[in-house]
Amino acid sequence: MAEGWLNAKLAGKGWLAESAGVAAWGGSPASPEAVEAMREIGVDISGHSSRGLSRERMAAADYILVMTHGHRSEMVRRFPDAKDKIFLVHGFSPDGERDVMDPMGFAVEVYRRTRDEMIAALGDFLVHLAERGELSSE
Protein backbone atom coordinates (compact mmCIF):
# COMPACT_ATOMS: atom_id res chain seq x y z
CA MET A 1 0.00 0.00 0.00
CA ALA A 2 2.81 2.41 0.88
CA GLU A 3 4.64 1.73 -2.39
CA GLY A 4 1.52 2.34 -4.46
CA TRP A 5 0.60 5.57 -2.69
CA LEU A 6 4.14 6.96 -2.74
CA ASN A 7 4.63 6.20 -6.42
CA ALA A 8 1.33 7.92 -7.22
CA LYS A 9 2.46 11.02 -5.29
CA LEU A 10 6.07 10.96 -6.54
CA ALA A 11 5.31 10.49 -10.25
CA GLY A 12 7.50 12.87 -12.25
CA LYS A 13 9.52 13.98 -9.23
CA GLY A 14 12.60 11.81 -9.73
CA TRP A 15 11.77 9.17 -7.10
CA LEU A 16 10.66 5.55 -7.18
CA ALA A 17 9.30 3.70 -4.15
CA GLU A 18 9.80 -0.05 -3.89
CA SER A 19 8.53 -2.22 -1.09
CA ALA A 20 10.29 -5.30 0.19
CA GLY A 21 9.36 -7.47 3.10
CA VAL A 22 11.50 -8.43 6.05
CA ALA A 23 10.03 -11.93 5.83
CA ALA A 24 8.73 -11.87 2.23
CA TRP A 25 9.77 -14.61 -0.15
CA GLY A 26 8.73 -12.67 -3.19
CA GLY A 27 6.13 -13.23 -5.84
CA SER A 28 2.99 -13.01 -3.70
CA PRO A 29 0.22 -10.64 -4.81
CA ALA A 30 -1.19 -7.89 -2.63
CA SER A 31 -4.06 -9.12 -0.48
CA PRO A 32 -7.58 -8.49 -1.80
CA GLU A 33 -8.19 -6.25 1.23
CA ALA A 34 -5.15 -4.10 0.43
CA VAL A 35 -6.17 -3.85 -3.23
CA GLU A 36 -9.68 -2.77 -2.19
CA ALA A 37 -8.48 -0.23 0.38
CA MET A 38 -6.18 1.40 -2.16
CA ARG A 39 -8.70 1.22 -5.01
CA GLU A 40 -11.05 3.29 -2.84
CA ILE A 41 -8.58 6.19 -3.00
CA GLY A 42 -7.75 5.77 -6.68
CA VAL A 43 -4.49 3.83 -6.37
CA ASP A 44 -4.24 0.53 -8.28
CA ILE A 45 -1.98 -2.02 -6.60
CA SER A 46 -3.61 -5.06 -8.20
CA GLY A 47 -0.41 -5.85 -10.11
CA HIS A 48 1.82 -5.70 -7.04
CA SER A 49 4.07 -8.65 -6.31
CA SER A 50 6.02 -8.97 -3.05
CA ARG A 51 9.80 -8.76 -3.01
CA GLY A 52 12.32 -9.88 -0.45
CA LEU A 53 15.17 -7.76 0.84
CA SER A 54 18.60 -7.94 -0.74
CA ARG A 55 21.94 -6.22 -0.18
CA GLU A 56 21.65 -4.67 -3.64
CA ARG A 57 18.20 -3.26 -2.94
CA MET A 58 19.37 -1.88 0.42
CA ALA A 59 22.49 -0.30 -1.12
CA ALA A 60 20.49 1.37 -3.90
CA ALA A 61 17.93 2.97 -1.57
CA ASP A 62 18.18 6.57 -0.41
CA TYR A 63 15.65 6.05 2.38
CA ILE A 64 14.36 2.80 3.85
CA LEU A 65 11.04 3.23 5.63
CA VAL A 66 9.85 0.49 7.95
CA MET A 67 6.57 0.03 9.78
CA THR A 68 7.76 -1.16 13.20
CA HIS A 69 10.63 -0.86 15.64
CA GLY A 70 11.05 -4.64 15.31
CA HIS A 71 11.48 -4.35 11.54
CA ARG A 72 14.05 -1.59 12.01
CA SER A 73 16.03 -3.66 14.52
CA GLU A 74 15.98 -6.71 12.24
CA MET A 75 17.07 -4.70 9.21
CA VAL A 76 19.90 -2.97 11.09
CA ARG A 77 21.04 -6.39 12.31
CA ARG A 78 20.98 -7.85 8.80
CA PHE A 79 22.24 -4.75 6.96
CA PRO A 80 24.40 -2.72 9.38
CA ASP A 81 25.88 -0.63 6.56
CA ALA A 82 22.39 0.75 5.83
CA LYS A 83 21.51 1.70 9.42
CA ASP A 84 21.73 5.46 8.81
CA LYS A 85 19.05 5.34 6.13
CA ILE A 86 16.54 3.06 7.89
CA PHE A 87 13.68 5.04 9.45
CA LEU A 88 10.31 4.26 10.94
CA VAL A 89 7.56 5.48 8.63
CA HIS A 90 6.42 7.69 11.53
CA GLY A 91 10.00 8.93 11.98
CA PHE A 92 9.20 12.15 10.12
CA SER A 93 5.88 12.73 11.90
CA PRO A 94 5.38 15.26 14.67
CA ASP A 95 3.57 12.59 16.70
CA GLY A 96 6.76 10.61 17.12
CA GLU A 97 8.22 7.28 16.19
CA ARG A 98 5.51 4.69 16.66
CA ASP A 99 4.69 1.43 14.94
CA VAL A 100 2.16 0.95 12.16
CA MET A 101 0.11 -2.20 12.69
CA ASP A 102 0.35 -4.88 10.01
CA PRO A 103 -3.24 -5.46 8.84
CA MET A 104 -2.48 -8.87 7.27
CA GLY A 105 -5.26 -11.32 8.05
CA PHE A 106 -7.74 -8.68 9.19
CA ALA A 107 -10.86 -7.29 7.53
CA VAL A 108 -10.76 -4.50 4.96
CA GLU A 109 -11.75 -1.98 7.66
CA VAL A 110 -8.39 -2.58 9.37
CA TYR A 111 -6.62 -2.11 6.04
CA ARG A 112 -8.43 1.21 5.63
CA ARG A 113 -7.26 2.41 9.06
CA THR A 114 -3.70 1.28 8.31
CA ARG A 115 -3.85 2.95 4.88
CA ASP A 116 -4.97 6.24 6.39
CA GLU A 117 -2.30 6.10 9.10
CA MET A 118 0.41 5.31 6.53
CA ILE A 119 -0.73 8.08 4.20
CA ALA A 120 -0.52 10.64 7.01
CA ALA A 121 2.97 9.46 7.98
CA LEU A 122 4.15 9.27 4.37
CA GLY A 123 2.82 12.78 3.81
CA ASP A 124 5.13 13.93 6.61
CA PHE A 125 7.98 12.09 4.87
CA LEU A 126 7.22 13.96 1.62
CA VAL A 127 7.29 17.26 3.54
CA HIS A 128 10.73 16.23 4.83
CA LEU A 129 11.93 15.57 1.26
CA ALA A 130 10.54 18.89 0.04
CA GLU A 131 12.11 20.83 2.90
CA ARG A 132 15.49 19.28 2.07
CA GLY A 133 15.06 20.13 -1.62
CA GLU A 134 15.11 16.46 -2.57
CA LEU A 135 12.00 16.49 -4.78
CA SER A 136 12.44 17.61 -8.37
CA SER A 137 9.59 19.35 -10.14
CA GLU A 138 9.93 17.35 -13.37
What is the role of each PLM region?
Residues 1-60, 127-138:
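Conserved active-site segments centered on acidic
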Residues 63, 69-138:
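Phosphate-binding/catalytic loops
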